[in-house]
A protein has these predicted regions:
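Basic nucleic-acid-binding alpha-helical/helix-turn surface characteristic of O6-alkylguanine DNA
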Residues: 10-130, 176-191
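Short glycine/serine-rich loop segments
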Residues: 130-174, 181
Length: 191
């Protein structure tokens, strides 16, 4: 069965974490950079992905509930970001990954709005100066695009490379942060 852009099993549609069932809320919405898929838990935003590239949610144990109301705080701040009125996000994140991935993603959160860093810079920031390729792989697995700003990571040469949403979207996000992208209609509305 498909729900919210990711696959779930008809007979196994619940997430069990530490013996407790968890509901994940989701919604799809258009944005200035293409359709987005939001997924949140009671603890925070779990995923923000570009719809055509949305990853499958672990199918065995996920209970999904479509809810614009549950995702309203995230939607509001993303609207402010796309309109140029927000440079940092204040809502909680529920990041799930390896210790190395979490270290990379936390380092990405330190990159200021409108600035870029190289993969090598991130590797050095997390204390693994030669692990820039592993940093690239962690960026590729970043489940919360835009908010955890992997679009701000570029090659050491200064060129754009590698982005889960595609280089066109990476360029648009960087242009937005430089004030050169038309924001388009608010999220959660029809285009």
């Amino acid at each position: 069965m498909k729900a919210g852009g990711f696959c779930i099993s008809e007979s196994h549609n619940r997430v069990i974490l530490h013996g407790v069932m968890e509901t994940l809320f989701y919604m799809r919405t258009p944005s200035p950079v293409g359709p987005l898929l939001f997924v949140a838990s009671a603890r925070g935003l779990v995923r923000l992905e570009f719809e055509p590239r949305a990853q499958k949610l672990d199918a065995k144990t996920t209970q999904l509930q479509e809810s614009k109301k549950a995702l309203a705080p995230y939607l509001r701040e993303l609207n402010e970001y796309f309109s140029g009125d927000r440079r940092e996000f204040s809502f909680p994140l529920d990041l799930r990954g390896t210790d190395f991935q979490l270290a990379c993603w936390h380092a990405l959160l330190e990159i200021p709005y409108g600035e870029t860093r190289s993969y090598r810079d991130i590797a050095q920031a997390i204390g693994h100066p030669h692990a820039y390729r592993a940093v690239g792989m962690s960026n590729n697995r970043n489940p919360v695009a835009i908010v955890v700003p992997c679009h701000r990571v570029i090659a050491s040469s200064g060129s754009l490379c590698g982005y889960g949403g595609g280089l066109d979207i990476k360029r648009k996000l960087l242009d937005l942060e430089q004030g050169t992208l038309n924001p388009g209609p608010p999220l959660g509305t029809s285009a």
